[in-house]
Amino acid sequence: MLLRLLLKKLKELRFTLLNILNNNILELKYFKLSEFDSPDEPGSGSKMDKKFLEKLDYARHNADVPFKINSGYRTKEWNAHIGGRVGSSHIKGLAADIHCNGSRDRALIIKSLLEVGITRIGIGRTFIHCDVDKKKDQDVFWLYN
């Protein structure tokens, strides 16, 4: 158990060191920033929190199943248009909604999110919401209708 934890921390450190060595240029293995764009603002995926994206990329690696991003960054206008919550973490670039194809993928995605320290997770029938908004309750799960 301790060895597994140490290996996990070493992998996290590797991602951080790569980011530093590359002059803080974010390099994602599994995502393009455009996947996180608000539909009404091309290029807005660049407003996503970089540390969150690194964690999400690492979670994708651990899960070994595709993470199709349904929603990443949202402008306030787009958030209102789709009926998003006022104060949504998507507006801050701290949240993503990941499509999931079934129970097995859902379990793998949630497990991998927890492994990288993403502990705010909402579970819907066809998607998983995850965020790292420190201004909200931590270590929480919720269900969507």
PLM features per residue range, with description:
Residues 1-65, 134, 143-145:
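Extracytoplasmic cell-surface/polysaccharide-interacting catalytic and binding patches
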Residues 27, 78, 87:
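Glycine-rich, flexible loop/turn motifs
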Residues 43-46, 95-99:
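The substrate-binding groove and active-site-proximal loops of carbohydrate-active enzymes
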Residues 57-83:
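Extended, low-complexity, intrinsically disordered C-terminal regulatory tails
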Residues 62-64, 91-95:
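Short connector loops at helix/strand junctions that flank enzyme active sites
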Residues 67, 96, 128:
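A broad, low-specificity signal marking well-ordered, structured residues that form hydrophobic/aromatic
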Residues 87, 91-92, 100-145:
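Catalytic cores and adjacent binding grooves of peptidoglycan-active enzymes
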